[in-house]
Each structure stands twice: as structure tokens, then as C-alpha cells.
Amino acid sequence: MKQRQFFGTDGIRGKVGAGKMTPELALKLGWAAGRVLSRSGTQKVIIGKDTRISGYLFESALEAGLSAAGLDVMLIGPMPTPAVAYLTRTFRAEAGIVISASHNPYYDNGIKFFANDGSKLDDEVELEIEAELEKPLTCVESHLLGKVNRIDDAAGRYIEYCKSHFPAEQTLSGLKIVVDCAHGATYHIAPSVFRELGAEVIAIGDKPNGLNINDKVGATSMGQICETVLAENADLGIALDGDGDRIMMVNRHGRVIDGDEILYILACDAQKRGVLRGGVVGTLMSNLGLDLALQALEIPFVRSKVGDRYVMELLKEHDWRIGGENSGHILNLDHGTTGDGIVAGILVLAAMQRQNASLEALTANITMLPQVLVNVRFEGDNDPLASEVVLAAQAEVEQKLGARGRVLLRKSGTEPLLRVMVEGDEQEAVTEYANYIADAVRNLV
């Protein structure tokens, strides 16, 4: 298959006003996508965005391009990425478009597409859109231009969808939860969801101003929520990222519960209820502790490349339901078509209620091994992964670690860096081993 030149593994992303993320390219992209999507289906597209100030700019540009190609547009304003996937399905739209750079700072933005079933757009369709980008922009006849409408009740629809994943006979009454919305797309959704299910909610990161998304808050900056959980004597914390597709949690003692531990909780709960349907998909970066804990329960575990797109590929290949990344992208195909931080949090809370157990109790039988990541710059044409010296250092460390450790060497896709990751039982030894391999890379001539 021809390689995509424009789309990455998760759409298009970059600094606003530079590279691909310009108004001109957004206009052309809307038109090109409209040309491809108008060949079949309902002739309508949903557009949602996060809270970045540049969202208005790209929303207008995409809207104009789609209209010029003859497609109707439905705007839903600031909404989580998984909400766009859900509403695309329920409105029988031909596609959904998300304007977001996820966990990146406000000065970045991105554009990604969902197919009509709420899944990521196929590579073949993205290649068709790229082919249209090479053509001069035209406009359909005036009577064929697309119309634009706003879905005023989009937030309410999605709130009810999220709540539907919590058992009707259960309530969160008596729980105090800190919810961190990262000043992002969940700011008007997540607090309402958990309050309406009965919890006492303390919301932080819920006052977006266009410039503060992911700024010292959210799933990639856990300091504030950990402090708030302790200060408020809360039962737990739920931290979402800027577009709401990833989650991290905090137990009552202020300890972070990452994506690997959330996967463990969901897999254990599904196994207890007899609905697991296979095993769990993690990634190359998933902690060995998850692998070992699932082995103890005789739950199969496989690793994909890093990225929720690749997790989804393996889930479909194995016909399994649960997978995700340690960064907090959680997929449960019985509860949606894409990563959804709010829904993942609801599923963990449902497991707590069913088992009458705290977050601490649900993670008592998984021990996360110390993990050290060292980024090493290499020079010239030297490929460290082809170096006998580096490979010998890796083999030596792997022999010392045995079955209770792991080494992963990955090259960066954007710069001459080798990422050296080592896991093992002892922090001091793991750090020593990672630096030993890193030194072998640095000494390459």
C-alpha cells in the first residue's frame, strides 16, 4: 500500500500556523475530505473540538471546505473526542472530525477523522483524501452547497451515553471524587456525569480560557490532582487529558493509578463476571508488572506497537475486547469504538461498587516494576540497533534480568534518538542497566 504523506498515526498535528496546521490547509482538507465522503452515505459530517483558542479558526476553515464540496456540517462545539465518535454513529453521519492536539500545549492543534461507525478512518480513505489534496480547489454549484447547523443538545446526549455504562441499580452516593478536566473538552461533561451518578465531585481544571489546556493539570500532569485528593480527603481522583480520550486515576493515598493498572482492574472484573472474551492487549511500553499479574490469573496478554491504533488492530485480530496503553488510552469494545476516559472511569467505579472494594484493594495484586527510560542521541549514519556493541550490551542486561525484567530499544521517528527502556525488580539495578546500554550507544563512532 502507498504510504500516507499527510496523515500520521492519529491524524494531523502540529504547531498552529506552521507546517500542516494552517488555515489554508484546513480549508483544503475540508474540501478534499468532502469530495471523498460525498461519493456515498448521508452527505453530512460532524465537527467537534477541544478548548484551544485556535479551534475556532480550524472549525471555520473545515466548515467552509466541506460546504464547498457539497456536504452538510453539524457543529457540536467543545466536546471530548469519544463524544464525536459516538455522535457520528447516532446521527448516522458519514464522518466525524475532531479538532484537537490531545495532551499537547495550547499552541498546537490537530485534525483527525472518524468513520461512520465511530472507528478511526481507514488508511485507504485517508489516501483518497490525500490524492484530492493534490487537485485545485473547486466549488459545487450554489444550489448544491452544504448547510451548517449546530447540535444544541450534544453535551446532554453524551452525558446520558456515559451514564448508560454504569449499572442502573448502582449509585456513587457516598463517594467523594476529584475530577480533573485539564481545562479541556470534558470541562462541562465529566463533573456532571459523576454528580448525576450520585458522587460528591470536586472539579479542577474545569475553567478553560483557550490558552490553559493541559497546563499543569490533566492526565499528563498529576501533581495538582494528587494534592487535591489528599487535601480533600477524597476517595479517589480521575484525571482526563485535553480531549478526554485518556485517563489516569489517583487512590485515596495520593498514588497514581496508570493505564496498566486500569487495564488490570477491568480485566479482573470482566473475568469475575465471565465476560472477558479472550485476553488483554497492551503495548511495548506496558509495564512487565501487568504482564506478570495477568499471567497469575491465566489471562492472555499480547503487546502491540505504541499507539491506540495498533492496540485496536490487535484487538480485532484476536477478537478480544480490552486493551490500552500505560499512558491511559483504554479501549473496551463492549463499551465503545475508541478510547474514552470518562467511560473507562465509570467502568472502574462500577467494578469497585460490584466488589465493594476500594481502588487500593482492586490494585493490591499487581505490582508495577521499576521502569527507567533514557533517551540517547546518536550521530551520523550509525544505526545503534545494528551495532554489535549495543546488541551485546542489551543481551548482557537481559541475561542479568532474567524473567523478572525487560529491555526495549526504540528509535524515535522524528529525531536521531534511541529510547532505552529497562524494567526490573530493583530501581537501582534498573537505572544502572539502562545507563550501561545508553553508554554503549554514546560510544559509537
Curated annotation (Swiss-Prot):
InterPro entries: A-D-PHexomutase_a/b/a-I, A-D-PHexomutase_a/b/a-I/II/III, A-D-PHexomutase_a/b/a-II, A-D-PHexomutase_a/b/a-III, A-D-PHexomutase_C, A-D-PHexomutase_C_sf, A-D-PHexomutase_CS, Alpha-D-phosphohexomutase_SF. It comes from the Bacteria. Its EC number is 5.4.2.10. Mg(2+) binds at residues 102, 241, 243, 245. CDD domains: GlmM. The keyword Magnesium applies. GO terms for cellular component: cytosol. The active site is at residue 102. Activated by phosphorylation. One of its GO terms (molecular function) is phosphoglucosamine mutase activity. Keywords: Isomerase, Magnesium, Metal-binding, Phosphoprotein. Its cofactor is Mg(2+). PROSITE patterns: PGM_PMM (PS00710). It catalyses: alpha-D-glucosamine 1-phosphate = D-glucosamine 6-phosphate. The modification Phosphoserine is found at residue 102. GO terms for biological process: carbohydrate metabolic process; peptidoglycan biosynthetic process; UDP-N-acetylglucosamine biosynthetic process. Catalyzes the conversion of glucosamine-6-phosphate to glucosamine-1-phosphate. Belongs to the phosphohexose mutase family. This is Phosphoglucosamine mutase. It comes from Shewanella pealeana (strain ATCC 700345 / ANG-SQ1).
